[in-house]
């Protein structure tokens, strides 16, 4: 079974027509996104994320290397048929209603009138806009435009969904609703490729991520593996100062969390001894767990090390 997305040594060089100066936006990107996966592409501004997506959509041609969609060359028109796309900056006609806009984009995708008639209300309800279908887009908020934009990308039931900042400007309730819809699509086997600066959203939703920096892959892997830390985290309440001093000497790091004292130990033995000491001092132990990092911490570390 071919990968949903696969690139091999992808290079893109932009040349200034006046100065002749070259800018290497992509410098040998090799990535594989398996069918049915949820994949997040991360990177600082100017890392090459947008250029990478443009090549997948055949809006730009690579200088070198190859990109395929479900085994077909990304430049092949047939490769784009199973793709649904939500750009970061979309410009839908403001005089259209949500319903008429979705109907229009469905027709561009080759959907029949009966199929569009059935699909439009289903999607409007799915993105929480069932009561706004007959309202002109000019009266939609930014978050509402993002949600109807997602519905547009889903009109023709794509096998691969490429989303560029899908929750930008969306309120917390709307984000939860969008995540729920995306999880449903994931369960249906849709491959979801997410390009976002919201690392917390990527961490909540994606199973696999790649961080690119200066046109190269700096790190890739499963989110759970990349955020797995080393050591053990012990959180306790009502810890006397004398006990804190004793544990500070053994703990790798210490801190405060929710009014409690947090200790991180390098190994299980130190953590067990700390728990025994806290219990003997009649402290309230709130939690003992493996230490972990957030995706944001991993991202910052990788970018600063490059």
Protein language model regions, located:
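Conserved ABC transporter NBD signature motif
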Residues: 65-81
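ABC transporter nucleotide-binding domain
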Residues: 178-265
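Short, charged/small-residue-rich alpha-helical element at the C-terminal edge
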Residues: 231-305
């Amino acid at each position: 079974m071919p990968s949903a997305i696969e690139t091999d040594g992808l290079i893109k060089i932009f040349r200034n027509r006046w100065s002749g100066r070259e800018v290497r936006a992509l410098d040998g990107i090799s990535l594989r996104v398996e069918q049915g996966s949820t994949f997040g592409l991360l990177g600082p501004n100017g890392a090459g994320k947008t250029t990478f997506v443009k090549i997948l959509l055949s809006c730009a041609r690579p200088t070198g290397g190859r990109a395929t969609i479900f085994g077909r060359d990304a430049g092949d028109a047939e490769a784009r048929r199973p793709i649904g796309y939500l750009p970061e900056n979309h410009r839908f006609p403001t005089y259209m209603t949500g319903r008429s806009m979705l109907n229009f984009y469905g027709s561009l995708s080759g959907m029949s009138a009966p199929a569009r008639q059935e699909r439009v209300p289903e999607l409007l309800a799915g993105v929480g806009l069932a009561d706004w279908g007959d309202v002109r887009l000019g009266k939609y908020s930014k978050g509402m435009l993002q949600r109807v934009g997602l519905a547009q990308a889903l009109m023709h039931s794509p096998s691969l969904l490429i989303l560029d900042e899908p929750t930008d400007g969306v309120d917390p309730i709307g984000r939860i609703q969008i995540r729920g819809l995306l999880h449903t699509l994931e369960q249906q086997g849709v491959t979801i490729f997410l390009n976002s600066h919201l690392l917390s959203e990527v961490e909540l939703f994606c199973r696999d991520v790649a961080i690119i920096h200066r046109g190269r892959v700096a790190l890739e892997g499963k989110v759970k593996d990349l955020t797995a830390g080393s050591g053990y985290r012990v959180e306790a309440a009502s810890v006397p100062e004398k006990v804190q001093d004793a544990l500070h000497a053994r703990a790798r790091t210490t801190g405060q969390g929710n009014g409690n004292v947090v200790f991180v130990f390098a190994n299980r033995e130190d953590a067990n001894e700390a728990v025994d000491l806290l219990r003997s001092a009649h402290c309230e132990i709130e939690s003992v767990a493996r230490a972990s990092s957030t995706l944001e911490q991993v991202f910052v570390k990788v970018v600063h090390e490059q």
